[in-house]
From Swiss-Prot:
<protein>
    <recommendedName>
        <fullName>uORF2 protein</fullName>
    </recommendedName>
</protein>
<comment type="function">
    <text>Plays a role in viral replication.</text>
</comment>
Amino acid sequence: MDLETRVSGHEKPKKEIRRIPDCQYAKTRSSPCEPLWGLEEAASRTSAGSWAHQDGLGDSSLFEIHGNQAITGSHQ
């Protein structure tokens, strides 16, 4: 029922679908999705802190801390 309701709803699905790509491209923009994606990338990529510094994000320090923990494995 939920899936059918979402499909029948035109405005809600469109907004959700449009929000997903926005979060993916949030790396270049300062949005609430940025820190979440940053932590995810920091665990898989060590360069996450680099693009965070280039974008001039205020939470760049958080990216570095989480990145170091992910590299050492102490976070796990």
